[in-house]
């Protein structure tokens, strides 16, 4: 067996679920502002603690995210949404606040709590998760789709779900009427 050279004591950090930048967090973030979003992803993935210096460096550099291409941001966002424990974002007010500052379109993070039981048993598809977090009366999903130039498939799914939600809100008897129609058609076919 070879020896592990660990000058940054990373092995200890892994044992203690600490995710942090190597060296000066300020310098690491300034080298690539996408590291802020990656930090959030790893923080959720490993359910780790946030050091004060890291927290301050992130807050100080949030504006740097504007300099990153939307495509790179979207790739990292999708990696975050695909985490099995994404819902744990709500367990940390600090992390939720950072996420909301970077992605203000996701104004419905409270809805994640309703999905906790589903998350415990299976992974929720990304499109559905986007719909839950984005769709509201303000058409946030349309702004998000435009801002990040998402695929047409995701746009269509979000628009379809948004339109269905509008129909449900406008017509309180939506399900009853649909049920009656389906029962009628089912009886007619037999």
Where are the regions a protein language model picked out?
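Glycine- and charge-enriched loop/helix tracts that form the active or gating conduit
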Residues: 1-146
